[in-house]
Structure formats: C-alpha cells, structure tokens
Amino acid sequence: MSAQKPGLHPRNRHQHRYDLAALCQTTPELTSFLIRTPAGEQSVDFANPQAVKALNKALLAHFYAVTHWDIPPGFLCPPVPGRADYIHHLADLLGETTGSIPAQATILDVGVGANCIYPLIGVHEYGWRFTGSEVSDAAMSSAQAIIQANTGLSRAIRLRRQKDPAAIFTGIIHKNEFYDATLCNPPFHDSAAAARAGSERKRRNLGQNKDDALNFGGQQQELWCEGGEVAFIKKMIAESQTFRRQVLWFTTLVSRGENLPPLYRALTEAGAVKVVKKEMAQGQKQSRFIAWTFMDDDQRRRFITRKR
C-alpha cells in the first residue's frame, strides 16, 4: 500500500497510495464508495462520479485543511494530485530567481473554475495570495461559496468576473497591479462535439454509464473553445505582451506535446525573453506547462525586490 506514484513532484503530498482509512475518517461519506478490486485490494469506485467527488472532498480536507468543498453538477471534478504538481513546479520556477520560494507570491488563476482547486492548494502549501478570473457566473458563485465557507480563505483569494469572454488578461489585471505568475488549465478541445467524444471515451474506459458525467463533465468554457488549445494559448501569448511589466511569469498547461512547436513560434514572435517547459507525470499520465517572461535576469530580480 506504500508504493510511490511515479513522476510526482517530491513535495507533492500524494506520493503514495491513498490512505483510505484516514480519508474515510476525515470524510465519512467516502466509506460508501469503497470497493474491492479483482486483486482484493480496497479502492475507490472511480467509475462512480459521486465517489470521485467524495474522494476530492476527503483529499482537500485531509491534506489542505479545506473543511467545506462542493461543486455543482456538470462542472469538472479535478484530480487533486495533478493539480498539486502544477503548483509545486510553479513554486520551483518562482524560486529560481532568488534561490528560495517566495512566501507572499501573488498568483493569477485564469479560469479559476467552480472547484477553485489551484488557489486552495497554493494558499495552504505556500501562503500565496490568489486572484481568480472566471467567465461563468455559476462557476464563480461556486468558487465564492467555497472561499466563504472556509476560515481565512477570503483574505487570501479574491475572484474577478471576466466580462469579456474573448479576453484573458484584459479587464482582470488592473493598472498598478503586479503578479509573480499566472497559471491556467486551458480548454483543450476545438468543438463541443470533440469535447463530448473525449468525455465519452473516458467513460467507456471506466465502464461508466452515459449519464454519470460528473468527473468527466465540464462546462463549455472548461472544455472547448474555437480553435482549441493552441488558439487559446496563442491569444494568451498575444495578450501577455500588454502586461509584460506587470507579470513576472506567464504559465499555462499544454495537454499535447505536438501543440508546443506553434506555441514556441508564437512566443518568439511576441518577444519572450525566456521560455521554460516543465514536464510532469502522474502515474501513466504525462503533462507539462510552459512559462514565459519578458524580463531578463536583472529585471526579474528587480521586479521581485520592488514587489517584496
């Protein structure tokens, strides 16, 4: 039961298999979703979307002191270990300039989502302060409910409504505001049909019923946009030029390695001074994020000194 998961960041709290007894003690409702695998081991019924939601609730309570967490039906129920990996690798990136991870970093989460997952992890692990942007009223209401239900989070996480669905940073980053980093889990499909096909494929792999869509659900803005992931990130790169002196590092997940070459070309055309790729692995799943800055080494050091 103590086998290490391959590839997770060394500081990730989910290095080992889930301690289901401890998680059930934290969140008793998880108990009703435990099953026996063909090998006779106890596990969570991952084909049941309510089980996945209960597991997330237990993980957030047990490891990140989130005592109240819920999401509305139809929104993404994110895998916590993978989301934590992004936060830890981002911390390493922010620590490279000065040699230590900043304790008071300010982070912009583009598309914070109904689950508010990145701020919840980042606040607990590093004491960072987050601004979360969101185009969906329902998602924003859900995230705000999570923040208000947990003591102390309202001082560390603020939400801003993106009124222009075609904009990413514009309207969110205000004049005279400065961020150590932005992060984003972009929509990766290029159409609603492609998003449905991807969700259906995942459900089939788990033997899940068609109507049980919670853990592979997601609203339009979470799953797809015109032109897919590449088009979305290219727009992000183009917009980032406007805020080149207000943000130290712009970052985003990239779901497919084959999407990297056109993004690298866009970054070169935009005048990015430095581009970094961080590879991540959660079990068999490979993922990555790219980061870019418009500041050289001296400018990055001065930015941090002024901001602190």
Curated annotation (Swiss-Prot):
GO biological process: rRNA base methylation
InterPro entries assigned: METTL16/RlmF, rRNA_lsu_MeTfrase_F, SAM-dependent_MTases_sf
Root EC class: transferase
Entry keywords, A to Z: Cytoplasm, Methyltransferase, rRNA processing, S-adenosyl-L-methionine, Transferase
Gene Ontology MF terms: 23S rRNA (adenine(1618)-N(6))-methyltransferase activity
Enzyme nomenclature, EC number: 2.1.1.181
Localization: Cytoplasm
Cross-referenced Gene3D superfamilies: Vaccinia Virus protein VP39
Catalytic function, reaction form: adenosine(1618) in 23S rRNA + S-adenosyl-L-methionine = N(6)-methyladenosine(1618) in 23S rRNA + S-adenosyl-L-homocysteine + H(+)
Presence of keyword Lipid biosynthesis: no
Stored Pfam families: Methyltransf_10
Similarity comment: Belongs to the methyltransferase superfamily. METTL16/RlmF family.
Functional description taken from the UniProt entry: Specifically methylates the adenine in position 1618 of 23S rRNA.
UniProt-recorded name of the protein: Ribosomal RNA large subunit methyltransferase F
